[in-house]
Each structure stands twice: as C-alpha cells, then as structure tokens.
C-alpha cells in the first residue's frame, strides 16, 4: 500500500534519482573541470558507493511512499560496472513505472544492448554542441560530436527513446541552438536546452553566462514555425514546443529564469549514499548508506525516508532571486556526486 506524503511546501514525492558513480570520462568545465578533477584526483573507493542491492532496496522502499519514476545518473553512469544488473533489479519492483538514464553517450554502443535487454527504454544524452571542434573544447577529452551522434543513432536503432540535453552558456555554445534544433528536428529526437545552472562549487557560474528561456525561444521563433505544447504531468520541468510542419518537439528548461521549485517531486541519492532534497543543496545530506548498514529494517528505513521528506523545504531556485549574493557564498554539493 502506498502512503501519500508531502514535504513542508506540500509537494508529493514521485521521482527518485540514483547517482551510481562519481566518475566520468569527460571533463566539462561546468561539472568536472580538468583543473580540479585531474589525473591524480581521488574518487570514491568501491566500498563507499551504494551497492546495487542497496539501491534496489532503497528504490523498493521509496515506492511505498509514492515514487513511480527512477532515473540513473552519475558522474557517468555507464562507467559503473554491470549497470544492466541494477536496471534488471529495478524493473522487478512493483510500483516502478518508468526507469531512465542520463549519460554523455560515449559508451552506448558498448553497453546499450545489455541495458535494453534488462528493461531500460529511456535515455537522456548530454550533448552541448554538434560542432566537432567546439564539442571537443567543452568535454576536454578530444571526443568529437560525431562520435556521440553515432552512439545516439545506435541507441535509437535498437529501440531506445532518446532525448538530448544541452546546457547553454552565453558566448560558449549559444550559437549551437539553431543548428541543434534543425538537426534533431530532422531526426525527430527531442532536444532540450537548459539554462546554465549554479551547481556545485567548481563550475565558475556567473549570471552573465545564462541564456534565458525567453532569449532562446526568440532565437528559435525567428527560424522555425512552432507552437507551445501543454504539460504532460505535474512537475514537468521542460516547456515543450512543436514544429508545425513535422510535429517534432524541443524543450526549454528554465532552471534559472523561471523556478519550478513549487512542483519539484524529486528525491536524490548521491553516489556515496546521501539523501538530498535538491540538486542545489548547500548542506551535507543524511547518510542513508550508513543508516542502512547499521542493520535497520525496511520499516525503519521507510520511516526515515518519510521523515526526511516531511522536513524538506528546499527551494533554491526561488531563493536565488531573493538573495543571490548570500546563496552564492554557500558551499554546494558537486554535481558528479549528487547527479544531474
């Protein structure tokens, strides 16, 4: 039986994001800049990560509190060995209606078929440019955009539903908006443009680098005949638009200019097993891993999850506009731990 719970702001819980690793094979400046995450950087040892059985248990308990959707994140989740085994286990949980994965796409040909066979059907690929030279400068690993586009084509060919996520930075890749809208329109793949977010302590965020949703929409409307699409469900973060000629859609995510805190239904477990109520958390999360490993029962674990949600009052994006300077000085949790 599902127990309906809400947080301090009346928001239900519907989504669980599981970060399965803090490692990544890219070094994008806004997430894991190479100057900080160099060759000598020490990542979490294996025993500090949640095991697949622990993640399965967490997900199963969360379904009793209303979780229906699970997204696997990182770091780069495809760097976690045997990830397909976790997907298979999550697919067996009663109450889980949807499982998704966010990836940079580099390893899709290597692992995609096993993931599909395990029951994964939806993938979001982070791709910030389709210009090869620009994309190489963004990922700092000399990976061409063409390489990722080939991986995307492969994923689509074996049956995955794919969406593309683009973090837009003014003066960096905002000139990619129109080419990417056109490219993925022709492919009939949804591309979503995300306002550059203030996540973590190392990404050099500055408001002047933000290209707002209204700016992006204006650019796109000058080139394409589009119409707005009604939201599909409560808490949907992207505002979607449809091309009138072929029906292909794209989305704009207003993570900075128009907060969606009031409808956020996500709980997050970091790669080291801590609970966070917000991607922009500024305090260390409750250590679920240690709590579980102390020998608690499922009932005790559920009670703790309920307690953590009941006291949740995170609304960082709302607060940013109210007291930007004070909030920018707070220490935040880096995205490779908490998951995008």
Swiss-Prot record:
Q: Which domain of life is it from?
A: Bacteria
Q: Which GO terms describe its molecular function?
A: 4 iron, 4 sulfur cluster binding; cyclic pyranopterin monophosphate synthase activity; GTP 3',8'-cyclase activity; GTP binding; metal ion binding; S-adenosyl-L-methionine binding
| Catalytic reactions on record | GTP + AH2 + S-adenosyl-L-methionine = (8S)-3',8-cyclo-7,8-dihydroguanosine 5'-triphosphate + 5'-deoxyadenosine + L-methionine + A + H(+)
- Domain (Radical SAM core) ranges: 8-227
Q: How does it assemble?
A: Monomer and homodimer.
Task of the protein: Catalyzes the cyclization of GTP to (8S)-3',8-cyclo-7,8-dihydroguanosine 5'-triphosphate.
From the Swiss-Prot or TrEMBL record, give the protein name.
Answer: GTP 3',8-cyclase
Which lineage?
Bacteria, Bacillati, Bacillota, Bacilli, Bacillales
């Amino acid at each position: 039986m599902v127990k309906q719970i809400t947080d301090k702001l009346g928001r239900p819980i519907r989504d669980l994001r599981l970060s399965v690793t803090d490692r990544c094979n890219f070094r994008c400046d806004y997430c894991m800049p190479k100057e900080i995450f160099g060759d000598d950087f020490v990542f979490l040892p294996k025993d500090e990560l949640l095991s697949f059985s622990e993640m399965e248990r967490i997900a199963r308990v969360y379904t009793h509190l209303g979780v229906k959707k699970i997204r696997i994140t990182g770091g780069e989740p495809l760097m976690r060995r045997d990830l397909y085994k976790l997907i298979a286990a999550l697919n067996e949980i009663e109450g889980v209606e949807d499982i998704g994965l966010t990836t940079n796409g580099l390893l899709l040909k290597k692992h995609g078929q096993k993931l599909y066979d395990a029951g994964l059907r939806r993938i979001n690929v982070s791709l910030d440019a389709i210009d090869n030279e620009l994309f190489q400068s963004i990922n700092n690993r000399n990976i061409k955009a063409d390489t990722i586009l080939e991986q995307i084509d492969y994923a689509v060919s074996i049956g995955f539903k794919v969406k593309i996520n683009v973090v837009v930075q003014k003066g960096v890749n905002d000139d990619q908006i129109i080419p990417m809208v056109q490219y993925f329109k022709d492919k009939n793949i949804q591309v979503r443009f995300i306002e550059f977010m203030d996540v973590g302590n190392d990404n050099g965020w500055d408001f002047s680098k933000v290209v707002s949703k209204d700016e992006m929409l204006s650019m796109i409307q000058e080139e394409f005949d589009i119409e707005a699409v009604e939201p599909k469900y409560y808490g949907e973060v992207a505002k979607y638009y449809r091309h009138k000629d072929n029906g292909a859609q794209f989305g704009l995510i207003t993570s900075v200019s128009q907060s969606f805190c009031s409808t956020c239904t996500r709980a997050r477990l970091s790669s080291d097993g801590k609970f966070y109520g917000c991607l922009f958390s500024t305090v260390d999360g409750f250590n679920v891993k240690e709590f579980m490993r102390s020998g608690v029962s499922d009932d005790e674990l559920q009670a703790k999850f309920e307690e953590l949600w009941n006291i949740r009052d995170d609304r960082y994006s709302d607060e940013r506009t109210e007291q930007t300077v004070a909030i920018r000085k707070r220490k935040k949790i880096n995205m490779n731990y908490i998951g995008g």
